[in-house]
């Protein structure tokens, strides 16, 4: 239903292939891709192309989808490039996006039609846009809205009006990930998340990072 709503309302959508493996190349905050998956391992190639095919065949007729994404935070390699070849062969006119080309520039011209980053500062975005940019720029993930944050959103919005090559971004998250339960003491309905149910380990408030509460009320 969501994709049909986007079609009707004119909401722009990027359809992302179900792939994320950042734990295989980001270790304790450092980029160490010696064993990143899928990378260029031939045994993974068929699996990732199958996921790209599933993405394309499921959503290809939705007019709201402007571009395809090869996945999220999975570094780069020949297998990712093979996914891009798959989408290119479909010749449906949509662009292809992949953020992790930023970490391996050897693939930047073969796995993404866009220059795309996560959580880049406004001044870094502007620096790229002022230096003869080859590709449109998108922040595929930014404004992680946890606690008293998101005060810098206006700085990014100003860039949209200033630069034709800046195409905005995707906020993570839109909605808090929480559930409504009845408080045993007060009897009131309250929103709870990781750790509130004595579950260990838990993500705690890390799941409460949306720009609206889980019940869709404004913060």
Which residues does each PLM region occupy?
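Extended substrate-binding grooves/exosites of carbohydrate-active enzymes
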Residues: 1-219
């Amino acid at each position: 239903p969501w994709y049909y709503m986007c079609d009707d309302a004119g909401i722009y959508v990027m359809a992302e292939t179900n792939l994320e493996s950042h734990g295989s190349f980001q270790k304790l905050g450092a980029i160490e891709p010696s064993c990143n998956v899928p990378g260029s391992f031939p045994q993974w190639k068929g699996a990732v192309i199958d996921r790209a095919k599933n993405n394309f065949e499921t959503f290809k007729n939705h007019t709201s989808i402007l571009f395809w994404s090869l996945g999220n935070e999975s570094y780069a390699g020949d297998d990712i490039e093979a996914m891009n070849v798959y989408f290119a062969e479909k010749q449906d006119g949509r662009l292809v996006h992949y953020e992790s080309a930023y970490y391996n520039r050897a693939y930047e011209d073969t796995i993404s039609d866009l220059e795309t980053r996560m959580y880049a500062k406004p001044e870094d975005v502007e620096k790229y846009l002022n230096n003869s940019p080859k590709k449109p720029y998108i922040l595929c993930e930014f404004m992680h809205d946890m606690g008293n944050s998101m005060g810098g959103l206006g700085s990014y919005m100003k860039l949209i009006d200033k630069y034709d090559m800046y195409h905005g971004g995707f906020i993570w998250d839109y909605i808090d990930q929480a559930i409504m339960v009845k408080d045993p003491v007060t009897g009131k309905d309250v929103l709870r998340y990781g750790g509130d149910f004595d579950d260990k380990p838990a993500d705690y408030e890390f799941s409460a990072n949306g720009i609206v509460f889980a019940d869709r009320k404004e913060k």
